[in-house]
């Protein structure tokens, strides 16, 4: 008799395969296609678009995330996160604002000296936001999709034959994922991209008007509030936030 962990969960995995498939399209393939089409039609400027993408990659992937990963191995930091949850969430939100808005400001002042129009600001913000979508949501959606497919066809059991406990953990975790949360994750990413465009316009305006510092501070505060609201919602509704 087949007693595999995925037995009886076929319908669940089918729904999740569909949901993760849709998420993978809208958070990985669609952003890439959108940028290619907009550049080809000259609706956006390629240089600010690329700089915006690099601003996110450097500030988050190369700097902030590794620092947080190191801190997460420290007992005092874990204790702080557990005992001071609100302050911990504020810290996460504010550091995202500090790192990303600082990178945005440096990108505009140092690498967009001749490209500071609204079109350039939109291009920069779109690149920043879509890079985040692709790296933090798109890639994980594809990974989860592959896991669900492997669980559905039974190949996951062969892959984890020597690690039944790990297989059980993966199976339980994926079975617990609500398809509603997957779809909400797509909506949340749309709002995040719109925010990145807004924040980029703020930085561009600050640089153009000679008030880069005050506009940068406004962008950091706005970013902190936006992320904090999203993180708090994630605690109660499982909305994805990155």
Residue ranges and their predicted role:
Residues 11-242:
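Hydrophobic alpha-helical segments at protein termini of multi-pass membrane proteins
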Residues 2-13:
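Short, small-residue-biased leader/transition segments that mark boundaries at the very start
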